[in-house]
Amino acid sequence: MRNNIKENILELIQTLYEAHSNAEALIKEKDNQSVCALLEDCQNAAIHIGESIEQSEGENFITVKYLEAYCELLYTTSVNISNGIYEKIKENLNAQLHVIEDSVRDDIKGKWEIVFLPYKVSMWDSLESIWKRAFEDDDFDTYVVPIPYYDRNPDRTFGEYHYEGKLFPADVPITHYEDYNFAERMPDAIFIHNPYDLGNLVTSVEPKFYSNILKNYTNLLIYIPYFLFPKEPQTHLIDTFALENVDSIFVQMKK
């Protein structure tokens, strides 16, 4: 399961704890109708959590079983409330929810989704070693998404279109840039090696892949230069458009 989905589930579980407290307050006000409606909302939330877990872990996963038991408890609780039985409602619901929370934390393995955005295959070696380590690690789902670029005309308009996705080594699984939906997937990290955005006078990547746009789709935008840095910092090497938007820079220094 993606780490961000796992975190969303844990956040939703916290809202269920709050709902249990709200239900207890409504019981004290003898508002049984509102209590039962709130418990139904809890059941719908639990079903949503279960569906998310089933998609990644399978329908027989242990956490799903705990959620099913929670839904049964919610139903029984609603029936009891309708019959005027209010004993240990919050305590019982919280106990079962705690079992679910522990299972989400301990039984569901979170995975990081990382996207690499090379544009020229000749510069792939700057990203390749990091990609390879992540690709071979079960904690990561990796996507190599080569992005198109254009030559610049003398007037700085876009000239010839280039896409080099078919030129990469055969052992590198390639995802076409039109097949990866950044807004839906929201990767945990994006790696780029072109920091210039609209500032390059010779070429330009497709504008929708400029760093200020990519930043909207991840919490960690990382720039890896495709050259070795000199021992003494050079201003022209670090003063580029993308550096206003990236979260980290990985560099290799000349010895």
What is each residue range found by the language model?
Residues 1-119, 136, 147-149:
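Non-catalytic N-terminal targeting/anchoring module and adjacent flexible stem/linker
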Residues 112-255:
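Active-site and donor-binding regions of nucleotide-sugar-utilizing enzymes
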